[in-house]
Amino acid sequence: MDIVEQFLKKYYMAIFFAVAVLLLSPTLQAGYIFLLDWTVAPNVTLADIHWGSDPVTTIGARLASMLISFAVWQRLFLLGIVFLLGLAGFRLARPTGNVYAQYFSGLFLIFNPFIYARLAEQPGIAAGSAALFWLAVYLLEYLAEVRMRKLFWAAGCAGLAVAFFPHSLFLVALLVSVVLLFDYERRRDLLFLGKSFFMLGAGVLLLNANWLAGSFLGQNTSRALAVVGFTAQDAQAFVTRAIGGDSVYFTVLALQGYWGEYQDRFISVQDNPLWEVAFLLMLLLAGWGIGKTWKKSLPTRALVVVFGLAWMLAIGVASPIFAPLSLWLYGHVPFYLGLREPQKWVALLVLAYAYWGSWGVKYLLAWKGIANHRKLVGIFCMALPVVFSFAMIGGLHQHLAPHQFPAEWQVAKNYLAANSVPGKILFLPWHQYAELDFAGKNVVVPARAFFGPQIVQGNNTEFGGVYSHALDASTLTIEKYVSKKNQPAVRIAYENFPPDMQALDVQLVMLAKTEDWQDYAWLDRIGIEKVLENDKLIIYKL
């Protein structure tokens, strides 16, 4: 082992930490990180923790926000995701005994379109994917070493993956089932198989027991109602997309197809002209890894099955070939429709590529034809994932730039503190997601998190052909007064708004001057009092 390999092996943790800092360096500025599915909550208290309905990951995040501030927690959380992704890949490739292969795997788990998109928009899914990858690491080590400690760690990672995003349960189930069944074919030990399934299932149940119990006892109705309200229309709205003129089959093979990519909400990996060359080279490495390890490697064969099934399910209803399978699952498997965004299955493709590719690197570097250039080729292989998703560096630098809440929002908050009301405060425009000028992008509306629990705000999806899943009486009453895009105009009896709101115990209306706020000009015509107005907000008193 030469000095370069010794350095890479000795300081791998520092190197992956440096990579994480490089990717996230813009977040070191002051402010909050506003993302599509990450509610910015600057004033978290114990009252914001719902012990019977929040996953342990959410409870932990809120406790951390109380201890070190939400802004600091955001940075640590993102840094931890990227760092642990790198370490997971490095550890996954440890059986290769090749440090270049380990770096290829670690960098690939960080630099790929799937993780990039989720870090940019849905960091909880990125964190859940990291937990899924660590589940694979510990499960494979357990099967190789038969040490219970490894199984306990695998069970914990399985539980965390589900806690971060509940429908990863299907991904966990597929990965675990296929790998354990392949192991049973070799071991022929039913007791070992049953013990493994039991421990992994127990890990999922224990780490999610509180919100699962809350759902069964009716204490977690919002989570349950959201899933119950999903329909086949949701599957069509969140269908996996063909990106950049490629077929949907190749798009998913290249770890893309997330609907957010189609909307150009962040820099695409395809903006880099070398992305496809790098991907095809890594595809060759993965293929070589499969070929060289097929006969002797249980994980290789198991991951081929996992990859094939996950690829089909990730494409889902976007393909006339695979649509019948997805539609059958939506109709017959409980809660599968909750996985309305099938592209999440791509996480398992990422895992498979990292594993196979690392073995491809190992055997490429063992080839006598490159004996005089082994170090150079090894570094080139390490760099391939970075070239593949090179746009991720600039993309995250742009997308994760922090922003401050406007001073006008703080003025409104001070007004509410000085003129408190016992009832509710309706926040308009009525959107769950809105293009907020101070956030610089379309994000989940942070009104309740900023102004307090009295706020009633939009819970409507408004994506594709899906407007909302809310069926409660309060929401339906409010939505009588909301003009819905792409729907026929109807006469709205605005004069009934004050008595309807009073019946809901709404005493103030707060209108943010963003998006379609001018569609709410009728508030000035129905005889309610305007008590505050600035450049960002208007507050009305009923």
Predicted regions and their residues:
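Membrane-embedded helix bundles of polyisoprenyl
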Residues: 16-22, 83-92, 100-184, 196-216, ...
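Membrane-interface coil-to-helix junctions
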Residues: 16-85, 107-129, 234-265, 318-322, ...
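Periplasmic/ER-lumenal interhelical loops and adjacent helix-loop junctions
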Residues: 42-44, 50-55, 201-203, 207-290, ...
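Membrane-helix boundary/interfacial segments in multi-pass membrane proteins
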Residues: 38-47, 63, 115-126, 230-231, ...
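Extracytoplasmic
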Residues: 147, 217, 224-236, 265-269, ...
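Membrane-interface helix-loop-helix junctions at transmembrane boundaries of multi-pass membrane enzymes
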Residues: 5-7, 186-197, 284-325, 367-376
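Transmembrane alpha-helices of multi-pass, membrane-embedded glycan-processing enzymes
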Residues: 77-88, 128-131, 279-282, 349, ...
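N-terminal membrane topogenic signal
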Residues: 1-15
